[in-house]
Amino acid sequence: MTLSLANRRASLPVAYRLYLPNAWAEDDDRRAKAGVPEAITFKTKPQIALEQIRWACEVGLPGSMALVDAGYGHDSKLRAGITELGKRYVAGIQPQMLVWKPGKRPGRTPKKGQRDAPDTTSVKDLALGLRARAWRTIQWREGSNEWLSSRFARLRVHVASSHERACEPIQEWLLIEWPEGEKEPTKYWLSTLPSSITFRDLVDAAKLRWRIERDYQELKQEVGLGHYEGRGWRGFHHHATMCIAAYGFLVSERETIPPSGPRAAARLPQLAVPDSYRPRGSSIAT
């Protein structure tokens, strides 16, 4: 479980915690062997994610928007918690998430096991029913790579869930991606970014998660995050901390070098090699 800070130029994990399944959390023998602290109890991944975001707010880390992938974005309590912290979000969601149909507003809370089926729809069905003019081709970039493009639609919706119904309903963006050649839409997001945001800026925000995916890849390939073979709680977190520190150094160095850097790196003076110098291992080295 990680929390990263990201902008359009760089990103870096700032919180890292091993997820402990409920079976482990309740197994005293396993906990003792792995050295799991007594204070660590079972929590769902969305609960841990919200704790990490809350911690970042409490210590004053910068950031006005939370990006959440589809594995977490379905959790209404996580989204509400982010809003309560004064942050906006762009959250990936699953196609089956229910929203109120355009023009409909949340009404009475249905009895358990019942749904106001005529007034709600899945985001997938809503997307499939949109007219052709609702879709626009939008371009975005991922770092210094070439421009990417896909088809998107966006509209304002109210989410239909028991948690949202218990609170004051809010209208938010539903962003849908349906690439050319695909039989159906491939990605969906909910966002509390301002209603005035431009279409392209909304897409840019949703696509910024590529930096986090790159972090995972480089942490494993460049600094050995995946090399840990121990079984200890403290050992794993120590290993992860050292890997993140090393990765932070690489990120800072990368920022001084074009095209990532804002300007050309300062040229360092080339020092002359002493006449007496011989390469290590040379047959004439002294």
Where are these regions (language model features)?
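Metal-dependent nuclease catalytic cores in nucleic-acid-processing enzymes
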Residues: 1-7, 248-250
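Domain-level cores of phosphate- or acyl-group-handling catalytic modules
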Residues: 30-105
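Generic structural signal for hydrophobic core residues of well-folded globular domains
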Residues: 193, 206-209, 219, 248-253
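Short, conserved catalytic/metal-binding motifs centered on acidic residues
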Residues: 3, 65-74, 89, 189, ...
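Basic, amphipathic alpha-helical segments enriched in Lys/Arg and hydrophobic/aromatic residues
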Residues: 223-285
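An anionic, glycine-rich sequence signature occurring as long contiguous blocks
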Residues: 6-42, 90-94, 99-211, 279-281
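Short, solvent-exposed helix-loop connector elements
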Residues: 77, 137, 191, 199-206, ...
